[in-house]
């Protein structure tokens, strides 16, 4: 397909999990989500290596991009009627996943991969129902940054560098089977700077990625 078209790929994966209620107040759980394996994506491009005789010639690029495996565990506590507190942790295995494992350039000048490292993610949150009619919610999530300074250039299209996330929400039960929820999601700004591996640029040339986000969910 051309650069303005879309491409699809078949993929599959699986998930295993278990939950155990220790007592009426505390429950624990754990899960494993396998990598989500996809066929390679393909698109039309041109040879980007100026040192090769076929520089600029049309080529078909293939890129394997899977979703990493995730190990997770969590705990939930209900200390008061209507109040639920929860905490969980996750470990994402980017370093063994196609598309994220490799880094740098291929011989034809295409990017070999994003070069992400494995990360831990922790999250805490709470929900409180008022008279079983109205709910208020809050949560916080911290994620390690999978992108090192050396790989910033290769991740300009996908700057997943944010680390601190805050969520607020509310809900109301309108009827027995009808509920309306509103949520606010804020990602605190984070920036990272790294070198540009291009010999045509002056020594010490750098690129900076910066990202933040605000979302409202209904």
Please give the residue ranges for each predicted region:
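Outer-membrane beta-barrel porins/channels
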Residues: 1-218
């Amino acid at each position: 397909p051309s650069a303005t078209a879309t491409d699809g790929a078949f993929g599959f994966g699986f998930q295993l999990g278990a939950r155990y209620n220790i007592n009426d107040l505390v429950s624990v759980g754990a899960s494993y989500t396998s990598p989500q394996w996809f066929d390679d994506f393909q698109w039309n491009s041109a040879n980007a290596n100026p040192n090769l005789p076929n520089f600029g010639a049309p080529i078909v690029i293939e890129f394997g991009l899977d979703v990493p495996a995730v190990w997770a565990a969590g705990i939930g506590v209900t200390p008061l009627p209507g109040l639920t507190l929860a905490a969980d942790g996750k470990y994402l295995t980017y370093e063994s996943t196609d598309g994220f494992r490799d880094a740098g350039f291929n011989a034809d000048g295409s990017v070999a991969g994003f070069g992400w490292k494995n990360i831990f993610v922790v999250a805490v949150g709470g929900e409180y129902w008022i008279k079983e009619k109205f709910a208020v919610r809050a949560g916080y999530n911290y994620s390690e940054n999978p992108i090192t300074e050396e790989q910033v250039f290769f991740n300009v299209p996908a700057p997943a560098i944010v680390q601190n996330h805050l969520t607020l929400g509310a809900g109301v039960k309108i009827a027995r089977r009808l509920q309306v929820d509103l949520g606010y999601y804020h990602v605190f700004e984070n920036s990272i700077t790294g070198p540009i591996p291009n010999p045509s640029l002056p020594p010490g040339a750098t690129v900076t990625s910066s990202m933040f986000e605000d979302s409202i969910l209904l």
